[in-house]
Regions:
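Surface-exposed amphipathic alpha-helical tracts and adjacent flexible/coil segments at the periphery
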Residues: 1-3, 28, 60-65, 163-165
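Short glycine-rich or small-residue beta-strand-to-loop segments that form or flank ligand, phosphate
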Residues: 19, 23-27, 62, 123-126
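Alpha/beta enzyme core
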Residues: 12-14, 31-55, 65-87, 97-175
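Metal-cofactor-binding active-site regions of metalloenzymes
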Residues: 91-95
Length: 175
């Protein structure tokens, strides 16, 4: 039903990455929950035309625990209470979850389940090497065990349509 709704939209569906990328890029992901909650009501009120709000990724999750000594799940739950009208989106590093090495399948499944229960609506799943087996467990878990959306992603750089580029072409990524 969600895909049907998306296809029917005539407007541009915009994802705001401020709650993840802005402070990750500018402040080494050190934005505290209290600061995010300070602007949450304004986001809910003025961002009501947004498709989604990207508020989680590896660095933001890790930093909230390791440096800010906060529980990232509680942060997500509190933001969800204050911003009930916008889809929440996150980056998920496939078999790495939000960490820096591969985790057992049951850990990835449990993380996804708990994240969805805590308020995550859309999981953008990728693998830095585009190794498809590293995506499978996460993508299957999202599709089969949550009501969340699985947004499968590949990573690339450069101009894939340029005739000057002969290795990483559109054909390369399709195959």
């Amino acid at each position: 039903k969600f895909a049907e709704w998306m296809r029917q939209q005539k407007r541009l569906l915009i994802t705001d990455t401020t709650m993840r990328d802005a402070h990750q890029s500018l402040l080494a992901a050190r934005m505290r929950s209290v600061d995010q909650l300070e602007v949450a009501d304004a986001i809910a009120q003025h961002g009501d035309k947004l498709f989604s709000l990207e508020c989680w990724g590896g660095a933001t999750f890790d930093t909230s625990m390791r440096f800010l000594h906060e529980n990232p799940f509680k942060r997500l739950q509190r933001l969800r209470e204050r911003i009930p009208n916008i889809c929440f989106q996150m980056l998920l590093r496939g078999a790495n979850g939000v960490g820096y090495s591969n985790y057992p399948d049951n850990v990835i499944r449990g993380f996804i389940k708990h994240s969805a229960e805590s308020g995550m609506d859309i999981f953008r799943v990728f693998d830095s090497l585009n190794y498809l087996p590293n995506l499978k467990v996460a993508m299957d878990s999202i599709r089969k065990h949550t009501n969340s959306v699985c947004e499968a992603t590949i990573c690339y750089t450069g101009d894939i349509l340029s005739s000057d580029r002969d290795k990483y072409t559109l054909k390369y990524y399709v195959e």
